[in-house]
Amino acid sequence: MKAVTYQGIKNVVVKDVPDPKIEKSDDMIIKVTSTAICGSDLHLIHGFIPNMQEDYVIGHEPMGIVEEVGSGVTKLKKGDRVIIPFNIACGECFFCKNQLESQCDQSNDNGEMGAYFGYSGQTGGYPGGQAEYLRVPFANFTHFKIPESCEEPDEKLSVIADAMTTGFWSVDNAGVKKGDTVIVLGCGPVGLFAQKFCWLKGAKRVIAVDYVNYRLQHAKRTNKVEIVNFEDHENTGNYLKEITKGGADVVIDAVGMDGKMSDLEFLASGLKLHGGTMSALVIASQAVRKGGTIQITGVYGGRYNGFPLGDIMQRNVNIRSGQAPVIHYMPYMFELVSTGKIDPGDVVSHVLPLSEAKHGYDIFDSKMDDCIKVVLKP
């Protein structure tokens, strides 16, 4: 089959790889019909994630049609249309039973964190979904079955696998409530979805921060938010604190280590002393009010010097963070899409054949052609 493979830093290649096979009784194989490129995939190609091997199949936002099921799969059959979450989870351990399936104890033998598709040996080493076919472990739990009556196109549903649901979880986990002022750092797909959900939760004011003008304008046009370009201000954190009269109730960091790096951070990252940048988190620590909440959703890797712990602790700021446990949220996300309460279609800017994955990665990474979200079609 054809698949998108990692071949080194900033080098992805579509090539032939072996077809996946049923390995355990609760596995299934899906024929992938759509698969998206995620912002966290960029961390892989930038070299920020360890244990990446050449020819590893990447991608973790797939959906498709069930092709084959193992003997232990009872909840699905051949021909079912499914969305596959980025979490791989057993459904039976303590964490899965307590709605923290992103930390499943049974799916990743390689570390403390949970398992994810296509995200290196660190997260289980499972081949990813940017391919013609995908093996799905723990298939009875690791899926959302789309009702047969659904006529929504893939482009509106594939984002439920990660970006849309992670955006909702960010807002939910941060405790955004009616009347809150919320700052969302980042106008990539997760940040854009988080902005939508802030309004759904009753926020009275939502401010989006980025430095890419077309993304800021997209946020303003589609999400009706205030926008701030951080390059227009010498100290963006203090500026945000000033315009919110003491800071926001909640600041959501939807950027992570992929923000703009200083020369020193660039050097440290190249030497593997530092994973990207902490610039978004520093802004968050300055822009949040006393007793407010910082929600860290953007991915960070490793340990960091310069973490503003004293500023956070002295002002009674709460920190919430983690990888979104998307599986138990997926039915609600589907309901929001199918009833028209949320339209994820405006986040998907490009639909390309799988064969053009390299181009998709290039425009997404370089922020060219007004790219916001790329969906690949095998």
From Swiss-Prot:
InterPro entries found in the cross-reference section: ADH-like_C (IPR013149), ADH-like_N (IPR013154), ADH_Zn_CS (IPR002328), GroES-like_sf (IPR011032), NAD(P)-bd_dom_sf (IPR036291)
Residues the record lists as binding Zn(2+) 1: 38, 60
Cofactor binding annotation: Binds 2 Zn(2+) ions per subunit.
UniProt xrefs under Pfam families: ADH_N (PF08240), ADH_zinc_N (PF00107)
Entry keyword set: Metal-binding, Oxidoreductase, Zinc
Lineage: superkingdom: Bacteria
GO MF, any single term: oxidoreductase activity
PROSITE patterns (UniProt xref): ADH_ZINC
Cofactor(s) in the UniProt record: Zn(2+)
Binding residue positions for Zn(2+) 2: 90, 93, 96, 104
Gene knockout outcome: No aldehyde-stress related phenotype.
Record EC number: 1.-.-.-
Family statement drawn from the similarity comment of this UniProt entry: Belongs to the zinc-containing alcohol dehydrogenase family. Class-III subfamily.
Protein name: Uncharacterized zinc-type alcohol dehydrogenase-like protein AdhB
Species name: Bacillus subtilis (strain 168)
Record lineage: Bacteria, Bacillati, Bacillota, Bacilli, Bacillales
